[in-house]
């Protein structure tokens, strides 16, 4: 990699699920994190959310598939960041999205990659850019 700086990112649940299960533009993130070009960050709360969403019946994943995705596609490449609780809600309309902002701040992320309008409408948070997957891939 030479002098190229690794890009630290927080990936919202909707994007991680799309990347792992459906490919498309979000799927372009997988080789980036596997090659070390980007370094995804996640808190325990975010990982719990990834698992919770993977268990949704609409995805038809069995326990072994969820285990595989978590232990072979996510955890080996992600840095787990310790995050404290927010002092007050940051996103009033959907405080559950605060976990992505708090993780990005604690982990000194460069970007949050999301498809969530509550996050995207912020555009940035404490100098951390918030982009959808297409915007992020085009920015590289």
Walk through the language-model features, giving the residues of each.
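Helix-adjacent hinge/juxtasegments
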Residues: 53, 58-84, 88
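A short secondary-structure junction motif
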Residues: 16-23, 44-66
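A secondary-structure boundary/capping signal
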Residues: 12-13, 42-43, 115-116, 132
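PIN/NYN-family metal-dependent endoribonuclease catalytic core
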Residues: 11, 27-57
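Active-site neighborhoods of divalent-metal-dependent phosphate/nucleic-acid chemistry enzymes
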Residues: 77-111, 117
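Metal-dependent nucleic-acid phosphoesterase active-site entry motif
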Residues: 1-27
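Acidic, PIN/NYN-like endoribonuclease modules and their adjacent C-terminal/linker elements
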Residues: 107-113, 117-140
């Amino acid at each position: 990699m030479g002098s190229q700086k690794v890009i630290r990112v927080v990936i919202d649940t909707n994007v991680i699920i799309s990347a792992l299960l459906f490919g498309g533009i979000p799927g372009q993130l997988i080789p980036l994190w596997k090659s070390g070009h980007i370094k995804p960050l996640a808190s325990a709360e975010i990982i719990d959310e990834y698992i919770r969403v993977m268990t949704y019946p609409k995805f038809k994943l069995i326990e072994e598939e969820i285990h595989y995705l978590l232990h072979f596609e996510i955890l080996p490449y992600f840095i787990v960041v310790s995050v404290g609780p927010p002092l007050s809600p940051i996103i009033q309309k959907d405080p559950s999205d605060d976990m992505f902002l708090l993780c990005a701040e604690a982990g000194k992320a460069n970007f949050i990659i999301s498809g969530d309008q509550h996050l995207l409408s912020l555009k940035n948070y404490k100098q951390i850019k918030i982009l959808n997957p297409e915007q992020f891939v085009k920015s590289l």
